[in-house]
Amino acid sequence: TDEFADFYNALQLVTPLVVAMAANSPTLFGHRLWQETRIPLFKQSIDCRPNDTLHPIPARVNFGNNWVREGAFELFAEAVLLYRPILPNCSDEDALAVLRNGGTPQLHELRLHQGSIWLWNRPVFDPVDGGHLRIELRAFPAGPSIVDMLANAALAIGLAKLLQPTIRELLPAIPFTYCTANFYRAAQKGMDAELFWPSLNQSQPEYLAVPQILESLIPKIPEQLLGMGFIEADFMPLIQVIEERLQTRQNGAQWQLQKLAELRQDMPKREALVSMLQQYQRNSAANIPVAQWL
C-alpha cells in the first residue's frame, strides 16, 4: 500500500542518522576501522558474487535498489526476480486456493528465500495470527546497553513517522544513490558524518552534520510517538538518552576509541583492548546509557 511505501521510504531516509548516532563497533581484530564496522564486515563476508564489473549482479546484503513506489509487494518481487534461491523449499501449499477460501497462505518458499537476502531494512511476511507484515531494523547495533538499543528504536520509529507525511515531496530532492551513500558514510564516520539532507527549499545538494540535522528533528518526535499509541512515560526517558548522547557526542564507538587511547598510554594494545572490553561489559550489565560512561 501507499502507506507502507511512505513509511518504508521515510525509514530508509532516516536510517543513516540512527546508524551514526548508534555506531558501536570501531575496531576489528585490534585494528581501528569504521565507526560501525559490522556493516561493511557483514556485506563483504556474505558477498560471493563473481568479480565482473561489466555485468554486475545485485548484492544479497543491500541497502536497497530504489525508493519504494507502491508497497511491500515490489520488495518481495525484487527478491524473487533478482536473486537465485540458495535453499530450495517446495511445499505442497496452493497459496491462491488458501487465499480464495479465506485462509492465510504460509508462503514457505518466499519466506525462506527472503531470509537469504539481507536488506538492512528488511520486509518480512509472517502468517501468524492471520498474517502480518513487519520491517526488521537490521542496521542498528546491539548495545552498548539495553536502554541505548531501546532509544535507537524510538529514534528510528519517531523520525520515520515524522517524515512519512511529506516523504513524497522530499524524495525528488534526494536520489536514492545519495541515501545509500549517506548510509555507508554514517557507518564509516559515525556522529562526525556529514550527510546529504533533502530540503524543499534547496537548489543544489547540501551536506549537513548529523547533530545539526537531529537537533531540529528530535523535539518533534514525542508527538509522533504519542500519536502511534506509545506511552509518554515509556518513551520520554529514551528520547532523553538520545538527547544526552547528542550533547556529549559520545556513542559506543566514540567511547571505545577514547577509552582505548587512554589505556594505551599505560599498557600494550592487547591489554588495553581487554581492559576496555571488561569496562564495557560492566557498564552494559548495569544498563547505563553510553553517554554517561566514563
Regions found by a protein language model. Name each.
Residues 1-134, 138-141, 170-174:
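Loop-rich catalytic cores of soluble enzymes, especially ATP-dependent carboxylate-amine ligases
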Residues 104-117, 123-132, 140-154, 158-294:
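Acidic, glycine-enriched catalytic cores built around paired aspartates
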